Curated annotation (Swiss-Prot):
This is Pantothenate synthetase. Coiled coil: none annotated. Catalyzes the condensation of pantoate with beta-alanine in an ATP-dependent reaction via a pantoyl-adenylate intermediate. The active site is at H37 (proton donor). One of its GO terms (molecular function) is pantoate-beta-alanine ligase activity. The reaction proceeds by a bi uni uni bi ping pong mechanism. InterPro entries: Pantoate_ligase, Pantoate_ligase_C, Rossmann-like_a/b/a_fold. ATP binds at residues 30-37, 149-152, 178, 186-189. Gene3D superfamilies: HUPs (3.40.50.620), Pantoate-beta-alanine ligase, C-terminal domain (3.30.1300.10). It comes from Yersinia pestis. Beta-alanine binds at Q61. Homodimer. Belongs to the pantothenate synthetase family.
Length: 284
């Protein structure tokens, strides 16, 4: 497995693969890799000849400097895991290589229809940072396919829209959320949980699934459902952050024409902000 840190060497390798007619898959990450990331790599391997994994803690998508400073950086362990899963290249650049003019003078790519609603409303600039770095990686690596986790539902929707609007010829693959045996969605931020909090954490998905079941049975009192879920989260020890039920395709409020809903949940447990989502078929 190749480990490349500079843009010229990356371009050279991508050019070589392109000349050889290789199909390239991209898995963008911020490192601190877990089994969920490995599932993305495994999926990418089935769809391409070579798999490029990027490891870059993107400063543009952090609104709090302390969050950026404390984000775990585990490059050596990450590379060992990726070697075992058969990745072909790890691109791990420095921020100065990605943003040579500095963050203040950086050109941005924004998807305003999706970047300022829901989670974007409470995290200003976050999704603009995501779309900017992903478009930059698309330009550098020129993948045929890119794999993203469905756990970050709004992020995946944003990237799909950016690809459609910007005319990228890239197949965007959403990979189902990987969960621990007790139902907790795998996340790099689970490492912030204490032992006691880790026992409580699966309640987030359980409360979400109970809500989804009520909707599947025909319940449509959205405000009441969300209030009940928030109260349940508080009771078990969470601080609810964001709870939404939206049209799965548009991320706008449900209408009579909505065929599928998505439940989007974010809640704090100690120092960890946990997120999860669940699709609900409304066509019954």
């Amino acid at each position: 497995m190749l480990i490349i840190e500079t843009l010229p060497l990356l371009r050279q390798q991508i050019r070589r693969w392109r000349q050889e007619g290789k199909r390239i898959a991209l898995v963008p990450t911020m490192g601190n890799l877990h089994e969920g990331h490995m599932t993305l790599v495994d999926e990418a391997k089935t769809r391409a000849d070579v798999v490029v994994v990027t490891i870059f803690v993107n400063p543009l998508q952090f609104e709090r400097p302390d969050d950026l400073a404390h984000y775990p950086r585990t490059l050596q362990e990450d590379c060992e895991k990726l070697t075992r899963h058969g990745a072909d290249l790890v691109f791990a650049p420095a921020a100065a290589d990605i943003y040579p003019a500095g963050l203040e003078k950086q050109t941005y790519v924004d998807v305003p229809a999706l970047s300022t609603i829901l989670e974007g409303a409470s995290r200003p600039g976050h999704f603009r940072g995501v779309s900017t770095i992903v478009s930059k990686l698309f330009n550098l690596i020129q993948p045929d396919v890119a794999c993203f986790g469905e756990k970050d539902y709004q992020q995946l929707a944003l990237i799909r829209k950016m690809v459609a609007d910007m005319g990228y010829d890239i197949n965007i693959v959403g990979v189902p959320t990987v969960r621990a045996k007790d139902g907790l969605a795998l996340s790099s931020r689970n490492g912030y949980l204490t032992e006691e909090e880790r026992q409580i954490a699966p309640q987030l998905s359980k409360i979400m699934w109970a809500l989804a079941e009520k909707m599947a049975l025909g319940e449509r009192q959205i405000d009441a459902l969300l209030e009940e879920a928030a109260a349940q989260l508080l009771r078990v020890g969470f601080t609810p952050d964001e709870l939404f039920i939206r049209d799965a395709e548009t991320l706008q409020p449900l209408t009579v024409d909505s065929q599928q809903a998505v439940i989007l949940m974010a809640a704090w447990l100690g120092k960890a902000r946990l997120i999860d989502n669940q699709l609900v078929d409304l066509r019954h």
